[in-house]
A protein has these predicted regions:
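Glycine/proline-rich, positively charged
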Residues: 29, 43, 83-172, 176-183, ...
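Conserved, mostly hydrophobic/aromatic
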Residues: 8, 20, 49, 62, ...
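Generic structural signal for well-ordered alpha-helices
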Residues: 5, 38, 59, 63, ...
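Active-site mouth loops of central-metabolism enzymes
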Residues: 21-32, 77-87, 118-120, 205-209
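Short catalytic-loop micro-motif centered on adjacent basic/acidic residues
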Residues: 47-53, 77-78, 141-145, 167-168, ...
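N-terminal binding-site loop/beta-alpha segment at the start of enzyme catalytic domains
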Residues: 1-74
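Alpha-helix-loop-beta-strand connector modules within alpha/beta enzyme cores
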Residues: 59-78, 127-138, 188-192
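Structured C-terminal cap/extension of enzyme domains
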Residues: 40-42, 46-47, 179-282
């Protein structure tokens, strides 16, 4: 069995439906332990590798791992937080250095959740214009957008620029509390943007008995890729097995899972910073 591969929207890239998130192995104490997680993911067939400049040691450790593997079949995605000008250029240059790459497949303008940040990245010296310079130079292949907290603002941003991909919280917890799917996905699909799901396991708060169901939920339509943070080779193996044997949830399974997710949120919401205080999903 192999992890299914899917077309990542207009990028034309075929990537595995399961991606390796870049936060969790960043938190491990030893570099080698983090590298082993990345290596196991690659060896088990995962091709989409996620990181970000703001994830502390994540980019550097991914760079270490990539030195020991053939990266020609891998898709490397990072994120930038600076909004404009020389600060952003330095952030991007630092990402190249830490990853030790000549070309980055996807760089995502990270955490666009407010009107002010929208204006900043669209400005003449804003993030998108800077990234376009790198694209013209052949250093960055694709540009994406991420957002965590304001679906309506994110939907507006999708219509303001021709992004290649979007990255949103699309797990069960978000579906029942602050749904990104309804306002954003049709817009993204109409523009042939690749759709990437994050917060799949609700920052590790998914009950152990429901973890495989949470992943199956995120692997189903509409996402092309579901990225999951993993900090051990055992977690890699567990998630790969689910992806290799992926079967969409039945209507009953999904209904019952969402009911349990809704009951879970009040117990864990204080640890899930991206969720609003009050429920917004219907």
């Amino acid at each position: 069995m192999a992890i299914p591969k899917r077309l990542l929207g207009k990028t034309g890239a075929q990537v595995t439906a399961l991606g390796l998130g870049g936060v969790c192995w960043n938190l491990l104490e030893e570099d080698r332990a983090a590298v082993e997680v990345v290596h196991r993911a690659i060896d088990r067939g995962i091709t989409y590798l996620d990181t970000a400049s703001s994830y502390k040691e994540s980019e550097r450790r991914l760079g270490l791992a990539l030195k020991e593997r053939d990266r020609s079949q891998l898709f490397i995605a990072t994120k930038c937080l600076k909004r404009a000008g020389d600060e952003l250029k330095q952030e991007i240059e630092d990402s190249f250095a830490r990853l030790d790459l000549e070309v980055i497949d996807l760089i995502q303008v990270h955490a666009i959740d407010q009107e002010r940040t929208l204006s900043q990245v669209l400005a003449p010296d804003g993030a998108l214009r800077v990234i376009e310079e790198y694209r013209r130079a052949g250093k960055i292949r694709f540009v994406g957008l991420t957002g965590h907290t304001h679906p309506e603002m994110f939907a507006k941003m999708i219509q303001e620029y021709d992004f290649d991909t979007i990255l949103n919280p699309l797990g069960p917890v978000n579906r029942v509390w602050n749904d990104f799917a309804a306002p954003t996905l049709a817009l993204a699909r109409a523009r042939n943007m690749g759709v990437i799901a994050m917060k799949v396991m609700a920052a590790g708060k998914a009950p152990p008995e429901d973890r495989s169901l949470y992943l199956r939920f995120a692997l189903g339509p509409p996402a092309d890729v579901a990225i999951v943070g993993m900090d051990s080779v055992e977690q890699v193996e567990e998630n790969v097995r689910v992806a290799e044997n992926f079967v969409p949830l039945s209507q009953l399974e999904e209904k019952q899972l969402l009911e349990r997710a809704l009951a879970l949120v009040p117990k864990v919401k204080k640890d899930l910073w991206w969720l609003p205080e009050q429920r917004l999903a219907s």
